[in-house]
Amino acid sequence: NKKNFTTTMKTKLLPLMLLAGIALSGCGTADTAADSFVRVENGQFLLNDKPYYFIGTNFWYGPILGSQGPDGDRGRLARELDALRDRGVTNLRVLVGADGEEGVPCKIEPILQTAPGEYDDALLDGLDYFMREAARRDMKVVLYLTNSWEWSGGYSQYLMWAGEEKAPIPGIDGWNPFREYVAGFIPNERAREMFADHVRFIVGRTNRYTNRKYSEDPAIFSWQICNEPRAFSDENKEEFARWIGSTARLIRSLDPNHMISTGSEGLFGCEVDTLLTERIHAFPEISYVNLHIWPYNWQWATAGHLDEEFDNARQLTREYLECHLDIAERLNKPVVVEEFGFPRDSVRFDRGTPTRLRDAYYTDLLDRVIGSKAEGGLLAGCNFWGWAGEARPAHHNWQRGDDFCCDPAHEPQGFYCVYDDDTTAELIRDANRRLEATPLPGEATKAQ
């Protein structure tokens, strides 16, 4: 039962997570009428007054491609957006930008916020350009504003800016020292206020290509507080919840139009505390329930045993999802599985490696979204991790100048990403066709 499942998470999987330091590892827009913004009504997303269900992707590096700096590639950006749209993918989860210094191992570059309140204008330009190009293709974009993990700065960078000692690097110094360090973000008022200033700057921005305020841009699906926000200790849980609530209220004070989301992994992002998971999603400013699912990272399936443990991974995935659907039902809010992934066969990274188990795992989740649409259910969408498209990474360990492929700099390139010639890419195309053809309750069956 679900109570026993939560107990299992606490007693068995959380210690593994603490030891391993698991992380991850969110045309037609001229009309500014309220209906062109996605909103929530009675537990459903509505777009143009119709229920909105989607199968989307993570594409955190899109704004970097949009820049005119040395790391940008507007030609590739256009091709990737077109390739995604061709596969029915029109919901993108994107990082606003990285924080801090360059030259840090396991961290992405280039850097948007180079010092508190100081920004690389080429990357702001790239963000504006990316948003315009997404809007031209009728895409919706989740913009997450910071990160609890080291790969883009986030918590640890704000702590250093607030005067704390140099942050440990998980891949070098170990995950436990990093976890202990970033647990200092939630109680650090100075670090939190610098982040709040960043929120004010980005949410208050006007796009230089469209001359439209971000707060008035229907292409934004939701503002997201953080990628995988965590308290990082039981002692921080109360203050963590208050921080989520206060940040959501800040965003709402700046933008009355868009949805707001947490970016949470769900239970595993809340110290395996069901009440905390529900509490951070219960704030009236928070529009929907987030969760992330990482069966390999969470050791539901392990290297050398992927085949034997695959059914276990699928079953635990279903149970984890059901726990969050229960929360959503109590809150009467939709659910988005905004990150999920599975390794290539034999946990290899090379392009061309078969994805037999990944495809089977994806099919389970994609079918759940399609089935939910048929029932008018609370599971409204998912974003797979992540789109690599035409990328050809030159190294397993990312180096600046290598193609971005959605696997962040702290992970092997090719680990979870989906290339345009993977069988997974066609699976996604087929799933979106089936989703589009699936009638809502009370509708006649759509033409296939």
Task: For every predicted segment, state its role.
Residues 30-33:
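Ser/Thr/Pro/Gly-rich low-complexity linker/stalk segments immediately outside membranes or between
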Residues 25-26:
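C-terminal motif of bacterial Sec signal peptides marking the signal peptidase cleavage site
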Residues 11-13, 94:
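Hydrophobic alpha-helical segments, especially transmembrane helices
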Residues 1-8:
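Short, Lys/Arg-enriched N-terminal segments with co-localized hydrophobic residues
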